[in-house]
């Protein structure tokens, strides 16, 4: 069995091409567990999680990344937040009926893929590409050609392992400032495209790579763990409350006795009573009643 929730980087010795392979199960399950999403929405979040992991490793930056789908369809938003440590969280918003076998365009409608990179140091960058491809992988390949001018191929698979949702993916990309031959890149992409879902989700990464590239010289680097991690906190909720008009906050307190702030990503609730609000307004730290 593979070591799930890991990202593996690899390099072809005789071609100016790099690759990545990632599988996720526990991370994906934690993203999905607090929601009752229709199956097509689960599949899109799984693909988005895999894609975000692969993109994060490719871009090689310190900071946060957000990859989101947004449009006018019944699933008008799906988003994965991550960082260079491969710590991920995600959520989707459903506002209409989802057909059982809905594809990406049926779910999102007229929409975009928005990639936002927020480095720990330096300027924030945002790239937007229209949802013109039939798959998320095709849209992101288009993004790389437009923004990075780097030929890139993504191969994303979703399924179940032992009855639980899992997903995996592979990425090939021409090395920056290298002159890889198109025929060589196409040859490697053709090999990679033969990967079966069952192989990717159930075999160790080294075996997958050997099956695909056993006639090539491949250097595989140490893997990086992928995990679910939510960045919500009581302090962040308090900061958000500071941005609301006092009248609005007081109205909620009068009506409900407390303010319940819910994190859509992890399901945590943060409760604030009148005393907490007074402390926030006085710039003190409120007590910590948090319920899961």
UniProtKB/Swiss-Prot annotation:
<keyword id="KW-0676">Redox-active center</keyword>
<comment type="function">
    <text>Redox regulated molecular chaperone. Protects both thermally unfolding and oxidatively damaged proteins from irreversible aggregation. Plays an important role in the bacterial defense system toward oxidative stress.</text>
</comment>
<dbReference type="InterPro" id="IPR000397">
    <property type="entry name" value="Heat_shock_Hsp33"/>
</dbReference>
<feature type="disulfide bond" description="Redox-active">
    <location>
        <begin position="263"/>
        <end position="266"/>
    </location>
</feature>
<dbReference type="InterPro" id="IPR016154">
    <property type="entry name" value="Heat_shock_Hsp33_C"/>
</dbReference>
<keyword id="KW-1015">Disulfide bond</keyword>
<keyword id="KW-0862">Zinc</keyword>
<dbReference type="GO" id="GO:0005737">
    <property type="term" value="C:cytoplasm"/>
</dbReference>
<dbReference type="InterPro" id="IPR016153">
    <property type="entry name" value="Heat_shock_Hsp33_N"/>
</dbReference>
<dbReference type="InterPro" id="IPR023212">
    <property type="entry name" value="Hsp33_helix_hairpin_bin_dom_sf"/>
</dbReference>
<keyword id="KW-0346">Stress response</keyword>
<dbReference type="Pfam" id="PF01430">
    <property type="entry name" value="HSP33"/>
</dbReference>
<dbReference type="GO" id="GO:0044183">
    <property type="term" value="F:protein folding chaperone"/>
</dbReference>
<comment type="similarity">
    <text>Belongs to the HSP33 family.</text>
</comment>
<protein>
    <recommendedName>
        <fullName>33 kDa chaperonin</fullName>
    </recommendedName>
</protein>
<keyword id="KW-0963">Cytoplasm</keyword>
<dbReference type="GO" id="GO:0051082">
    <property type="term" value="F:unfolded protein binding"/>
</dbReference>
<keyword id="KW-0143">Chaperone</keyword>
<feature type="disulfide bond" description="Redox-active">
    <location>
        <begin position="230"/>
        <end position="232"/>
    </location>
</feature>
<dbReference type="GO" id="GO:0042026">
    <property type="term" value="P:protein refolding"/>
</dbReference>
